[in-house]
Amino acid sequence: MEFTIKPLLPGMDFAGEVIGIDVASPINSSVYDQLRNALGKYAVLVFRNQNINDDQQIAFSEKFGSLEKSLGFDRGGGVTHPEISRIANVDDNNKIRSHGDEKSRYHRGNSLWHSDSSFKPIPANISILSGREVPPFGGETEFADARYAYDTWPGSISGVEKKDLEGLICEHSIIFSRQLIVGDIFSEEDKERLKPVRQALIRRHPETGRKVFYLGSHCHFVEGWDYSKSRALITELTSWMTRPEFVYAHKWAPVDLVMWDNRSVLHRGNPWPDEEYRRVMHRTTVAGDQPTV
């Protein structure tokens, strides 16, 4: 099976469209190796016209590693596989949820820049998202190239240089990030299960060797720093990483499939008229194999 990749951002090795692969069909191991290499180069891969079911999505995803089990917040809608996270504004009766519905509020946290599962002790490697139903406008997924942002960061306005950040540890928490946008929606049981974790502020990709600032909305503070100083640094670095020149915005068409490397990018979902148009996305997540600390 031969395929080509069309760069989606002229002049950058970031975001590419894969042409010539049907992920529901048998794919030999050499093609998976080529896709791994392509993901290392582009960090985001787009596959158009992939009308797949959950079994097919899981089978394709498992070729890249073991899959995470979804959080309970991302179940429902008839999904029976724990490997599938359903991110949707549609309830179990196939009706559009109200804007104030608990799950709608929870999923609005995805509108903040983040790296999937950075709130877990061993964060995710790869995410694969299938657009089962998409709105006619809005609801784009934006991706920021954390590699290029790290390479080009000129240093902080507060006098902090890149070398000063080596070895620093940050606390990541999904409880913290969700409170930023929707308030306290977690039970005491959830808070016990989702305790904060420690992540390196700078991490090196184990396959490509490239470094990134490992941040996003789950990142709460820098260990050992004054809280206000650490929040200012996180805000400054995140603003730099998500400058327009580092960002690819994916406009979804029905049954698009998008794969990205969480070790190389931040991403977020854009809003849409969510009480008018349906948006149903199914995600599989390739588990990480080592902690960052």
Give the residues covered by each predicted segment.
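Fe(II)/2-oxoglutarate oxygenase catalytic core
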Residues: E2-M259, R263-V293
